[in-house]
Amino acid sequence: MVLSDLGLDLDLEWEASRMACLVARSIGVRDPLDVMHEIKSVVAGKRVYVVGAGPSALKSYMRIESGSCIICADGACSLLTHLGDVIAISVTDLDGGIEPAELVFDRGGYIVIQIHGDNYRSIPHIMDHLRRWRDRVILTTQVHYQCSGLTMIPGFTDGDRAYVLAKALGASEITPIGMDLDSEFSTYLSKNIYGENSPATISKIRKLRWGRRIIGGLYLNYVTTERPGPLGL
């Protein structure tokens, strides 16, 4: 059902995973479980702000509590320039550009990169960045591929993967910002082809809806300060 609804090519996803494994071995990434444990020490028991790349992210004034951390989706990490010293994790497929991930890394954060059928051909062009990041990077794929340098985080957008990561690593409270999973619009934070409030592609809208279902399955500990109602979305 998911494959047909999103138009995913399973063969292409396997090829992307194979490429990701080669990249992981080439740059000598750390065991993703070891890096996850490091991130967990930052996230567990803390309030986590999950910052999506939706239109409302550009209109939100982020007031981040001391001692909390941010998990940002793709280009939404560029919003960190307006904040002070805050711990951040980037969850990205790099559609929003490489600069937001660089910003997170340069501030001492971690980068979780999703390599999939739409972006794997561009990965060889950023090998220098990946080598620099290798001690604080996790490579993830859409399908389970037997490779020690890879792992999986469920989700179809960087935003819902960011939420799943926060939940899995023991955040005490999750506050979403810019998680516009019911929207039919997107921004340049999500992909460079968009403006500040551009109509999203059909594929993007379907991914957002599936992301909403994933987060809905984790609703028991979902906390929002943005809007009332189911999921606060």
Residue map of PLM features:
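N-terminal donor/sugar-recognition subdomains of glycan-related enzymes
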Residues: 1-48, 58-60, 185-187, 193-233
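Acidic/Gly/His-enriched mid-domain segments of enzyme catalytic cores or analogous surface patches
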Residues: 2, 29-30, 42, 67-69, ...
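Short, hydrophobic/glycine-enriched beta-strand segments
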Residues: 47-54, 69-71
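Glycine-rich anion-binding loop/nest that anchors nucleotide
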Residues: 50-55, 158, 173-187
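Short, contiguous, helix-prone interaction/anchoring segments in small proteins
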Residues: 56-58, 65
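Generic secondary-structure signature for well-ordered alpha-helical cores
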Residues: 132-135, 142, 171-172, 179, ...
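Internal, active-site/partner-interface "lid" segment
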Residues: 143-145, 179, 187-194
